[in-house]
Structure formats: C-alpha cells, structure tokens
Amino acid sequence: MLKSNNASETAARKVGDKTAKKVFFRRRKGCPLSVPHAPVIDYKNPELLIKFVSEGGRMLPSRITNVCAKKQRKLNNAVKIARILALLPFVFQAK
C-alpha cells in the first residue's frame, strides 16, 4: 500500500506542478443589452445608439461591444433607420 500511496503522491505532485503556473483567464462579459433592466433597442433612442457607433460613424463590431448576435442585428437596423430619419449622422465630422 505504501508504494501505491507514494505513486499517487508523485502523480499529484506532477499535476500540482503543472497547475502551479498561473494561467491568465479572462472572464467573458455577457451582453450588456440582455440584462434584466437593459434599455430597449429603438431607432428613437439616439443616446443609446451612439454608444455603438465609432467616431467615424461606423458600427462597432460585437467583439468589441460584447453584444450578442441577435441584439447586434437589431442595433444595425435601428442605426440604419435613425440615419435615414436624420436622428444620427451618416458620417461624424472631425472636431
């Protein structure tokens, strides 16, 4: 029994040595528009839409904004409608 116990201890040490290295793990943030009290995506809310548009007037990708695919499509459509109705500019001017 001592031999099997020693073998398990050495195996645990080997595993422990591998896990002793600190592994960087970035926690993935959830969709900011899917939380319970999130604002409704609507073309009549330019304050919300402007947060998802870059300084040049382009839509920010979901990998930067952490918005899920379903909400990203809704945002794209809302921004397009808001631009047509002149609630948002097509191109932001440099200051």
UniProtKB/Swiss-Prot annotation:
Keywords: Ribonucleoprotein, Ribosomal protein, RNA-binding, rRNA-binding
GO biological process: one example: translation
SUPFAM superfamilies: Ribosomal protein S18
Signal peptide boundaries: none
PROSITE patterns in UniProt: RIBOSOMAL_S18
InterPro entries, A to Z: Ribosomal_bS18 (IPR001648), Ribosomal_bS18_CS (IPR018275), Ribosomal_bS18_sf (IPR036870)
Keyword Nucleus tagged: no
GO cellular component labels: cytosolic small ribosomal subunit
Coiled coil: none
Keyword Nucleotide-binding recorded: no
Function: Binds as a heterodimer with protein bS6 to the central domain of the 16S rRNA, where it helps stabilize the platform of the 30S subunit.
Quaternary data: Part of the 30S ribosomal subunit. Forms a tight heterodimer with protein bS6.
Name under which the protein is recorded: Small ribosomal subunit protein bS18
Organism: Rickettsia massiliae (strain Mtu5)
